[in-house]
């Protein structure tokens, strides 16, 4: 009962904020409660009978978490999780306000949480996750993290706080370093997942992990591995298992990595109750996470939304553009504090853009002029630009495609009334 006053205040704040800003504003109540009742988070999560599972890394957290949660739920377990928009510390408090009781009790079997790589270590040390899955370390937000080694160090702290098993990407040298450090602790269990080199078409660019500037470590044997990847389907092997043709929510080898990580994580969570066929069918039926290959019908026509957050995700999404993306809106928002990273991407697959917009729209237009990507207009007023773009005549072939950074994504989705992150269909 000691948390009751803080929870009541937090819920009141949540209602008031939602009245002012539908579909947003969940961070403020969580922030207030985290100051008034800092012990609530650990108290709520550590009482869950199945413990806490953490999924973290630079990219792919939202999709991997959604996949793992869906698999475990299909096995009959109730899972507490956080929306991908609430993956920092106050977001966890906000999720408890929404889904917990007035005393902070969570009536679930276990928690599977997506955690921002900068916040995960602080939270993990308090809640002691049973299982942690670390997806990757990519070059991202240099203004925030300075050096990828700092991210690796933070993720290593999460791994060290894990009580049962740490799942790592065996193709990422940063994850191999984390695993090497963990191996000095005899009681620590480590599992490896990844994409086999032979699974990738020679024309595909490999996933670009952050450099370590250290001697390369030998790759580990992958326990759960993607053995083939074609279009939007994968096959994978795991100990005693071989599964063919799992459909991914969208095209791209990053989705293949998310799927194999989710499969490996769910198998570790469920143990001998894990049903591989059920897991595969669950993955095949899942829609994408919002704005990650999400397709919406607007004005009677399909529009695809693609989120790009850093050089690797921009590159992967551009490489997977097809002729379906025949009319493109490209928006870079104020979240890109250092637009110079835009120049590190190969834009050869982006031949023509209709509209360039966003807080950093002029920077993007300058970039396109430099690299030779044709564009029809620059409109820095984001909401006016998206309205004008969506009002264009339907393309004669393909569909309208919106490529945007996180800030532009949030503003556009709110403007279009897409306030529920779970309201996505396949």
Which residue stretches match the model-derived regions?
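A generic structural signal for short, well-ordered alpha-helical segments in conserved domains
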Residues: 65-69, 263, 365, 413
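Acidic, Mg2+-coordinating active-site environments of NTP-dependent enzymes
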Residues: 50, 138-301
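Short, charged, surface-exposed secondary-structure boundary motifs
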Residues: 90-91, 141-148, 198-206, 339-340, ...
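Short, basic, glycine/proline-bearing loop/turn elements
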Residues: 103-110, 138-143, 263, 299-304, ...
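Buried hydrophobic packing segments
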Residues: 68, 72, 92-96, 259-269, ...
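Phosphate-binding loop of NTP-binding sites
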Residues: 4-189
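Structural beta-sheet core signal
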Residues: 113, 132-134, 168, 192, ...
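ATP-dependent carboxylate-amine ligase
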Residues: 1-30, 160, 189, 267-275, ...
């Amino acid at each position: 009962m000691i948390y009751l006053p803080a929870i009541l205040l937090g819920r009141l704040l949540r209602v008031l904020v939602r009245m002012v800003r539908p579909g947003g504003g969940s961070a403020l109540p969580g922030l207030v409660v985290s100051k008034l009742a800092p012990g609530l988070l650990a108290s709520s999560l550590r009482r869950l009978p199945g413990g806490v599972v953490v999924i973290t890394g630079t990219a792919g957290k939202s999709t991997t978490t959604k996949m793992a949660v869906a698999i475990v739920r299909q096995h009959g377990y109730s899972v507490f999780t956080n929306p991908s928009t609430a993956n920092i510390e106050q977001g966890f408090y906000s999720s408890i306000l929404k889904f917990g009781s007035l005393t902070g009790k969570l009536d679930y079997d276990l928690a599977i949480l997506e955690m921002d790589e900068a916040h995960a270590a602080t939270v993990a040390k308090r809640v002691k996750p049973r299982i942690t899955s670390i997806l990757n370390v990519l070059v991202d937000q240099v203004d925030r993290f300075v050096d990828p080694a700092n991210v690796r160090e933070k993720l290593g702290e999460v791994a060290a706080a894990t009580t049962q098993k740490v799942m790592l990407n065996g193709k990422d040298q940063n994850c191999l370093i984390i695993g090497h450090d963990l191996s000095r602790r005899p009681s620590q269990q480590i599992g490896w997942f990844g994409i086999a080199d032979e699974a990738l078409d020679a024309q595909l660019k490999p996933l670009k992990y952050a450099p370590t500037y250290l001697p390369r470590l030998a790759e580990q044997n992958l326990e759960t591995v993607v053995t083939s990847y074609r279009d939007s389907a994968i096959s994978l092997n795991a100990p005693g298992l071989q599964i063919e043709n799992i459909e991914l929510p969208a095209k791209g080898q990053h989705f293949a990595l998310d799927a194999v990580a989710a499969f490996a994580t769910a198998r570790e969570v469920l143990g001998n109750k894990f049903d591989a066929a059920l897991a595969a069918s669950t993955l095949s039926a899942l829609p994408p996470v919002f704005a990650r290959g999400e397709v919406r019908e607007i004005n009677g026509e399909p529009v695809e939304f693609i989120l790009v957050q850093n050089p690797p995700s921009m590159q992967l999404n551009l490489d997977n553009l097809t002729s379906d993306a025949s009319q493109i809106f490209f928006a870079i928002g104020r979240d890109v504090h250092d637009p110079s990273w835009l120049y590190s991407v190969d834009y050869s697959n982006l031949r023509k853009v209709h509209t360039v917009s966003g807080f950093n729209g002029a920077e993007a237009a300058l970039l396109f002029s430099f690299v030779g990507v044709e564009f029809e207009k620059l409109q820095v007023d984001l909401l006016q630009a998206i309205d004008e773009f969506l009002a264009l005549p339907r393309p004669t072939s393909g569909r309208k495609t919106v490529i945007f950074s996180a800030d532009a994504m949030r503003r556009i989705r709110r403007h279009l009334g897409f306030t529920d992150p779970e309201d996505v269909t396949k």
